[in-house]
Regions:
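Membrane-interface helix-boundary motifs at transmembrane edges
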Residues: 10-11, 65-79, 134-146
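Membrane-interfacial loop-to-transmembrane alpha-helix junctions, especially the N-terminal start
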Residues: 13-24, 73-86, 146-153
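Hydrophobic cores of alpha-helical transmembrane segments in multi-pass inner/ER membrane proteins
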Residues: 22-26, 52-65, 115-131, 186-201
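C-terminal ends of transmembrane alpha-helices
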Residues: 29-37, 91-102, 156-173
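Short, hydrophobic transmembrane alpha-helix segments
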Residues: 35-47, 66-72
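Non-cytosolic membrane-interface motifs at loop->transmembrane helix junctions
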Residues: 41-51, 102-114, 173-185
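Membrane-proximal helix-loop-helix units in multi-pass membrane proteins
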Residues: 85, 89-144
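C-terminal transmembrane-bundle signature of multipass membrane proteins
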Residues: 160-173, 181-214
Length: 216
């Protein structure tokens, strides 16, 4: 099966502000509309959580593949994609609740093993980042002006927007509405993180993070 047209369409969508905003808002509105007909879709391990996991998995995979395919491992683009892939892998494990997939002990062991893998990946990314930290921080204005950073940051804000619903900050709000609010904001956030992973990062590829070598 040829997925090239789908990939090209998604990439084109990710480059359009109106397209990205429409996709995120439509997904959130559709979730609410579906919930009104099927009120169980926001329960644990139901439709909304599976869609969230799907978008997270796609975002993590795209970032990971782009980092793997980056020819210059000293470029800012490599660090951005590798770091975001590692971060989203952690979010994915948090979202999946693998130990709840079944009663067999193997599920709990699998989740623990994946947590160890996540930790090792994060340590490896931090080891790579440490000698380049000063250079990265000096590039902050450029980094935060990049589309991938802006979309990822907005995705993070949508995740934060769901937090008050999760913690039931709004007193008097029915639990059903609070749960729906949390899941809807997270769905929009994870879709946005996926679209952000498709952003053009050519500018980041031109920036080298190679540590300065001391003169002999």
């Amino acid at each position: 099966m040829n997925f090239t047209p789908v990939r090209e369409a998604l990439t084109s969508l990710s480059r359009s502000n109106a397209g990205v905003a429409s996709a995120v808002l439509l997904s959130m509105a559709a979730s609410i509309a579906l919930w009104m007909v099927f009120p169980d879709i926001d329960d644990e391990n139901h439709l909304l959580e599976w869609l969230q996991a799907l978008f997270l998995a796609l975002a993590c995979t795209v970032h990971g593949m782009r980092a793997w395919q980056e020819p210059d491992r000293q470029s800012l683009r490599f660090l951005m994609h590798a770091g975001l892939s590692a971060l989203l892998f952690g979010f994915l494990l948090r979202e999946l609740d693998i130990d709840q997939f079944g009663t067999a002990p193997a599920w709990a062991q699998l989740e623990k093993a994946l947590r160890v893998v996540e930790l090792l990946i994060l340590i490896r990314v931090l080891i790579f980042f440490a000698p380049r930290a000063r250079k990265v921080f000096s590039l902050a204005p450029q980094i935060f002006s990049m589309r991938i950073t802006i979309l990822t940051a907005i995705g993070g804000l949508l995740m934060i927007a769901g937090w008050p619903f999760d913690k039931k900050v709004f007193h008097g709000m029915p639990d059903a509405y609070a749960l729906l609010g949390e899941e809807v904001f997270e769905l929009g956030a994870y879709l946005l993180l996926f679209l952000a992973s498709l952003s053009d990062t050519t500018a980041a590829a031109r920036i080298s993070l190679a540590p300065n070598r001391k003169a002999a």
